[in-house]
UniProtKB/Swiss-Prot annotation:
Keywords: Disulfide bond, Glycoprotein, Hormone, Secreted, Signal. This is Prolactin-7B1. Belongs to the somatotropin/prolactin family. Disulfide bonds join 100-216, 233-241. GO terms for cellular component: extracellular region. The keyword Secreted applies. PANTHER family: PROLACTIN-7B1, SOMATOTROPIN,PROLACTIN.
Amino acid sequence: MNTSLTQLCFWALQILLMSNLLLWEDVVSVPTIGSGSGVSEMLTEDLFDDAIILSQHINSLAIETRRIFLSNNFSSDMFITFTLQFNRHDEFVVNGLNSCHTLPLKSPKTEKEAKRISLPDFMNMILSILRAWDNPLHHMETELKSMPGAPFAILARVKDIEVKNKILLDRIMKIAKKVKYGFEENEVYPAWSELASLQSANEESRFFALYKLSYCLFVDTDKVEHYLKHLKCRYFDGYMCQDSVNQINLL
């Protein structure tokens, strides 16, 4: 009786060991990250999602910055005046806001136009927009620090945008290296040339430079967000476009 029980336990233990061995072989046989196209595609989708979420956050910060400029005692009088002049089609203000320094990039205005641009060129256009803001964001923060009464809420957001803009640039470069499609980095980007206005002794000129920067920053951060969604949609052959999170609304 005892011998039979011992044998039964022995065989049960053998079966358990064999089961564990087979399970372990199944685990180690799973492809490592990047070894299969399916896993690689998942990782690329995650990179796109991270970049899009970050671009949305930057765009929200740009909107908040403009809202504070329009409502804070430091700048509201000047900003409201410029807004009223724009609504009255004042030539100086309208021309100013229609000449953001990234205008030479000739960004697509419709989805149809965007589809005519190759994926590598589209990627470089997004990178150029981000690089074009390095210098103006730095000077915007520097000059605001020197202006009496400049609220911390604006300074903090401009600094946050500057830092996150660099992070987003790095993340998009990682996507570019994975996407490839003949991608060759083009480090040419539009130069910002209005530092003199931002440093002007004339208060109106100085505040209009800030007004224009805050407006163009909002426009370009919004573009980057929507362009990344468009890029993701095209990279995954369009099936992502039906997702409400990735709806495209090009400016």
